[in-house]
């Protein structure tokens, strides 16, 4: 049995339950022309984000991670929801947010990993093709992100 089979993801477009620990905050960042920036790592397209540090808010975590990994400034950040991750007896949340791209600076080395990540702006309506999530929860999250972005940004 693969490790992935032991992990269950469920998408909730709700406020986070207080007792549920948050292990990551990731975001979908939109440009003014309805594109989304994706991080490219080892030939795979991914969202950007990471672990909250030093009692950061979700917004602070997302802004820091986008600077560290892609050197992109964000603004107009909205909470989207969370993925409930059930891994054996462990339960935790992966928070998802949306944001507008404020400024894109030259690529640089991520201080946390020592890597320089690729980045690409892709049409928002093609994001599922690039991320290629196998699970329903990830695809539901993308649908909700696109809807919230249309309501708030476009």
Summary of predicted features, one role per range:
Residues 52-75, 80-136:
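Unchanged
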Residues 19-32, 143-148:
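A short, compositionally biased N-terminal segment around positions ~18-40 that is enriched
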Residues 1-26:
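Acidic, metal-coordinating catalytic segment for phosphate/diphosphate chemistry
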Residues 45-48, 55:
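A short local loop/turn or secondary-structure capping micro-motif enriched for an aromatic residue
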Residues 21, 45-46, 110-115:
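Short glycine-enriched loop/turn motifs at secondary-structure junctions
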Residues 25-46:
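Short, contiguous, helix-prone interaction/anchoring segments in small proteins
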Residues 11-12, 16, 84-86, 143, ...:
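Class I (Rossmann-like) S-adenosyl-L-methionine-dependent methyltransferase catalytic domain
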């Amino acid at each position: 049995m693969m490790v992935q089979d032991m992990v269950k993801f469920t998408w909730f477009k709700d406020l986070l339950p207080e007792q549920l620990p948050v292990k990551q905050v990731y975001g979908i960042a939109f440009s003014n022309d309805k594109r989304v920036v994706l991080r490219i790592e080892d030939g795979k397209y991914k969202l950007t984000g990471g672990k909250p540090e030093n009692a950061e808010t979700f917004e602070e975590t997302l802004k820091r991670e986008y600077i560290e990994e892609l050197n992109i400034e964000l603004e107009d950040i909205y909470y989207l929801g969370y993925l409930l991750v059930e891994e054996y007896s462990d339960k935790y949340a992966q928070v998802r947010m949306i944001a507008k791209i404020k400024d894109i600076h030259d690529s640089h080395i991520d201080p946390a990993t020592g890597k320089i990540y690729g980045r690409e702006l892709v049409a928002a309506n093609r994001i599922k093709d690039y991320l290629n999530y196998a699970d329903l929860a990830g695809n539901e999250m993308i649908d909700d992100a696109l809807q919230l972005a249309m309501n708030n940004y476009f």
